[in-house]
């Protein structure tokens, strides 16, 4: 009888150990995903604008794609509104987490242009993104697409309003130990959170995100904050976050000087609302005016809602930054951020898109 009880206890212990290990290993799979649904350390995308040439057959849903396992841009065979697109595959993890109602998984979705908006509010940062994580790891998606994504209850879709202009974004997989730093960066960016779930198990380490989730933040917000982050596979990133009290152009006044490099910037340029190229400080900032896709194909920055910058070709420090803010006077009054890397693949990919840029007058 005693032996049977011991055997039963051992079987139970092994079963619990297996389930525990399975839970941890299963939890570790939250990550950026490629179009095959496989985990990748990071990816970046460039959604192409819908151009007026009807003969091209372009829908405004085509995109370029690059990840940690590839060397250069490739044009995806998927469309951005497809669940098999890189965003569809990655966000599938959000819908699974939402359906499971797990207390071990958290998410936070934010956008200054929320889906189905009633009134646009300038109270919050000009910043768009999504985080999904557990106590092992997760991902941070930073993008420029207004009204994206829909709330989890509605599943994956891409907004019709996101077709006309170009859009950009980057997804990075992070271990959980990076989320405390991300938590502080988000406080400064002051995102407009429209869907979130952060169980109490995370509240001890992550102070600000639960407050942002409930819009109850009482923390003092610094004017700006810079932090170093490391992806799950060791890729280094710098994240610049500015609040609405830092009343200056984030590119010229801070990023170029801190990175010690001349920057070529691609942001949404509305006529008579853009800042001119700036050579008044030691490190200069130039506006990109056109993006080339091939020898015979290009589009104007006026058709581009993407937000990125790179070091000028031939300079020592080769940086690429992707983020939230435009080079326009009113954006000095908005909070937001950029994540930057010296990854050579990413730099080469974006550098190859520059057709020409505006010199200083």
Swiss-Prot record:
Q: Which residues form the signal peptide?
A: 1-27
**One GO process term, biological-process aspect:** apoptotic DNA fragmentation
Under the heading CDD domains, the entry gives: PLDc_DNaseII_beta_1, PLDc_DNaseII_beta_2
Top EC class per UniProt? hydrolase
Principal localization reads other
Gene Ontology cellular component annotations, sorted alphabetically: extracellular region; lysosome
Q: What is its EC number?
A: 3.1.22.1
Q: Which reaction does it catalyse?
A: Endonucleolytic cleavage to nucleoside 3'-phosphates and 3'-phosphooligonucleotide end-products
Tissues showing expression: Highly expressed in the eye lens and in salivary gland. Detected at lower levels in lung, prostate and lymph node. Isoform 2 is lung specific.
Gene Ontology MF annotations: deoxyribonuclease II activity
Name this polypeptide is given: Deoxyribonuclease-2-beta
Organism of derivation: Homo sapiens
């Amino acid at each position: 009888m005693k032996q049977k009880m011991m055997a039963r206890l051992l079987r139970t212990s092994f079963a619990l150990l297996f389930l525990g290990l399975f839970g941890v290993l299963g939890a570790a799979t939250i990550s950026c995903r490629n179009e095959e649904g496989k985990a990748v350390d990071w990816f970046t995308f460039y959604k192409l604008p819908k151009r007026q040439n009807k003969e091209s057959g372009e829908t405004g849903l085509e995109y370029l794609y690059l990840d940690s396992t590839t060397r250069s841009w490739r044009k995806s065979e998927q469309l951005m509104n497809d669940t098999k697109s890189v965003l569809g595959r990655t966000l599938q993890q959000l819908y699974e987490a939402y359906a499971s109602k797990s207390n071990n998984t958290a998410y936070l979705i934010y956008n200054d242009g929320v889906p189905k908006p009633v009134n646009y509010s300038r109270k919050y940062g000009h910043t768009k993104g999504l985080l999904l994580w557990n106590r092992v790891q997760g991902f941070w998606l930073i993008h420029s697409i207004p009204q994206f994504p829909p709330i989890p209850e509605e599943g994956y879709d891409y907004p019709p309003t996101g077709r006309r202009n170009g859009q950009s974004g980057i997804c990075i997989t992070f271990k959980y130990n990076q989320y405390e730093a991300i938590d502080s960066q988000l406080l400064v960016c002051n995102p407009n959170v429209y869907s979130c779930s952060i169980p109490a198990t995370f509240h001890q380490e992550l102070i600000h995100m639960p407050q942002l989730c409930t819009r109850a933040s009482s923390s003092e917000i610094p004017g700006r904050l810079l932090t170093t982050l490391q992806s799950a596979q060791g890729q280094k990133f710098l994240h610049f976050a500015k609040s609405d009290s830092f009343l200056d152009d984030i590119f010229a006044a801070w990023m170029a000087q801190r990175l010690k490099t001349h920057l070529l910037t691609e942001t949404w340029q509305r006529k008579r609302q853009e800042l001119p190229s700036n050579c008044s400080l030691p490190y200069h900032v130039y506006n990109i005016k056109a993006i080339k896709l091939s020898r015979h194909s290009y589009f104007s920055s006026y058709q581009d809602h993407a937000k990125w910058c790179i070091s000028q070709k031939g300079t020592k420090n080769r940086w690429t930054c992707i983020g939230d803010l435009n080079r326009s006077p009113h954006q000095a009054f908005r909070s937001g951020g950029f994540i930057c890397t010296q990854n050579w693949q990413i730099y080469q990919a974006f550098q190859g898109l520059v057709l020409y840029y505006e010199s200083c007058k």
